[in-house]
């Protein structure tokens, strides 16, 4: 076999490998603070998944049916969203394309943030904030009622390594990855980035609503 033929076979092999790996690479998400997840979502609910089934959701450009997983849910509480309760949640059929797997049977409670689809439906992906309810801190649970919403005009900037800086007064530096090597660290569990009366934003700690003027860090 000549050098040209070997080069062609190698190129075709690499192309095939890239094609096979592409679906897994398609689901890539940047970590977000729980407050950012709340602010970015159309719908935020506490719910249980009762049942699941695969359904058709139209066709792709080639006429092939698009499959999705439909979860029938029992909504326990809505923190953000439409007036109508959410009855069904949809997601992609595989984690390779950002599909989410929920335990069904109505025993496990979740906090679920995602995009509204109207008429009691929403769509979720692995890039959305979906966690078991019992893993949230008490502060996080209470912040869902009002405090996260108060900070939606602020910008939370993740610090991947030292040094890192804010570029405007309405930013809060999220340091969990640097200080704890975790995106579920102290700031994620116990702090919210809230706008102050002078228009700047700062981290606030505590379950009670912030005072009109507050320090960067307050104890509960």
From Swiss-Prot:
Residues 27-30, 95-96 are annotated as: Involved in metalloproteinase-binding. SUPFAM superfamilies: TIMP-like (SSF50242). The keyword Secreted applies. Transmembrane segments: none annotated. SMART domains: NTR. Pfam families: TIMP (PF00965). This is Metalloproteinase inhibitor 2. The lineage of its organism: Eukaryota, Metazoa, Chordata, Craniata, Vertebrata.
